[in-house]
């Protein structure tokens, strides 16, 4: 059995399974699930393995890989996509038809089924929202073998109840239950625990004429955060943040980063023409913000914008290199807070991180959504210290009205955080939905809820 089916990008160790199935049809999956249900055999669904919370890692039982569900048909305004299709292939196919698929999770090698299962986001979610917003139809195989073909707006046939949800733009912490919700919003973000998503129809948009891209450098963090507040309503589709430690790491590969830069914002803005007045408006905004305008980087070509995106995506690689060389252990967060608490939360993060792990962290990410990631370089001999701090930060995020999981899902690694977010009765409501759709608890055992 290939180790590929026993692990994902989370690094969660100990994955093992008795059998791996690679079906080609919904009816094959239905038969496998009926057999598993009869034997109470746990089943883990395998996408591309890019998830970072361990949902795909099996601990016994069977694995169903969706790699052969690779149908991809692009039509005006939508695409029909098998669960095993990779995100980059959907993007490429849409581009060939002068269209684009707005969701853009960082890992373009992720599968569409996995993106829907964890309701993935990305940098463009600032303007376009998470994956679920773009799903118009789903095919799902339930644990009892029933095959559902579900359209957007089709209400579920039972009342799941309603749980209080945070006032944030992104949230993937458990099942986001509300009375009258539709099936698509129930399955999107359920992380393979309620059914097997095999195919989707997703909306596409006409490709913009051009896109302005920029990496804007600032002399201080305060200047960058002032710019975030000023630019949020200016219509960018991307508004990303890098702190001073992030820039220090990135200088290893990009020595042309200005020496006086202590923060950076990555922006993209769609243009209606090559002479769009938005170009001049952005020049004025950047100068008014006191940015290092002459030293910042700008582009309107796709190749240069891709270079900027790779610049941002170099950071996780450099973090991993740093952790490996130092013999440390990386821990990270996926918390988000309401927009009004963005600056306050960031200051509180820094205060606690400097007190406990001075100089051993970076903060970067989706500042436009008040959703930044902390990567913490902790001592592998004392993981509890780092875990306790991250849980403290999670409690603070919830206290501020936020979420403990904005885009990565809960998986198996972060099940302990749901009790920080929700009261026992709200977790009980989620478990009731799980029992309704998967009474034998065969799907994704240990994901979302501890085993």
Question: How would you name each of these model-derived features?
Answer:
Residues 71-75, 83, 87-88, 92-235:
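FAD-binding subdomain of flavoenzyme oxidoreductases
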Residues 403-410, 445-448:
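Short acidic/histidine-rich active-site segments
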């Amino acid at each position: 059995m290939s180790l590929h089916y026993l692990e994902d990008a989370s690094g969660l160790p100990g994955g093992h399974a008795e059998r791996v199935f690679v079906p080609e049809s919904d009816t094959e999956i239905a038969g496998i699930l009926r057999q598993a249900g009869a034997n109470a055999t746990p089943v883990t669904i395998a996408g591309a393995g890019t998830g970072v919370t361990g949902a795909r890692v099996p601990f016994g039982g069977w694995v169903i890989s969706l790699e052969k569900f690779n149908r991809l048909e692009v039509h005006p305004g939508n695409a029909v996509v098998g669960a095993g299709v990779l995100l980059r292939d959907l993007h490429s196919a849409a581009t060939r038809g002068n269209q684009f698929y707005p969701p853009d999770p960082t890992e373009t090698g992720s599968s569409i089924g996995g993106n829907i299962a964890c309701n993935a986001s990305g940098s463009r979610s600032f303007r376009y929202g998470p994956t679920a917003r773009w799903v118009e139809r789903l095919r799902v195989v339930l644990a009892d073998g029933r095959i559902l073909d579900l359209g957007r707006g089709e209400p579920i046939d039972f009342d799941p109840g309603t749980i209080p949800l945070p006032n944030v733009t992104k949230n993937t912490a458990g099942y986001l239950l509300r009375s009258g919700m539709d099936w698509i919003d129930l399955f999107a973000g359920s992380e393979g625990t309620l059914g097997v998503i095999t195919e989707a129809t997703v909306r596409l948009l006409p490709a913009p004429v051009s896109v302005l891209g920029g990496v804007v450098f600032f002399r201080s963090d305060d200047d960058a955060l002032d710019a975030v507040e000023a630019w949020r309503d200016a219509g960018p589709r991307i508004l990303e943040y890098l702190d001073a430690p992030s820039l220090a790491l990135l200088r290893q590969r990009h020595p042309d980063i200005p020496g006086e830069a202590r923060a950076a914002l990555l922006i993209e803005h769609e243009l209606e023409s090559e002479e769009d007045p938005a170009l001049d408006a952005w020049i004025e905004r950047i100068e008014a913000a006191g940015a290092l305008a002459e030293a910042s980087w700008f582009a309107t070509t796709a190749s240069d914008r891709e270079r900027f995106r790779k610049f941002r995506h170099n950071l996780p690689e450099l973090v991993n290199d740093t952790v490996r060389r130092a013999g440390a252990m990386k821990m990270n967060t996926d918390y988000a807070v309401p927009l009004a608490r963005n600056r306050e939360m960031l200051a509180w993060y820094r205060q606690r991180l400097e007190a406990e792990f001075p100089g051993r962290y970076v903060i970067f990410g989706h500042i436009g959504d008040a959703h930044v990631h902390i990567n913490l370089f902790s001592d592998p001999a004392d993981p509890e210290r780092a875990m306790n701090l991250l849980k403290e930060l999670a409690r603070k995020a919830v206290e501020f009205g936020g979420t403990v999981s904005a885009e990565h899902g809960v998986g198996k690694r972060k099940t302990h955080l749901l009790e920080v977010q929700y009261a026992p009765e709200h977790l009980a409501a989620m478990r009731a939905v799980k029992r309704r759709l998967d009474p034998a608890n065969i799907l994704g055992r240990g994901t979302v809820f501890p085993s």
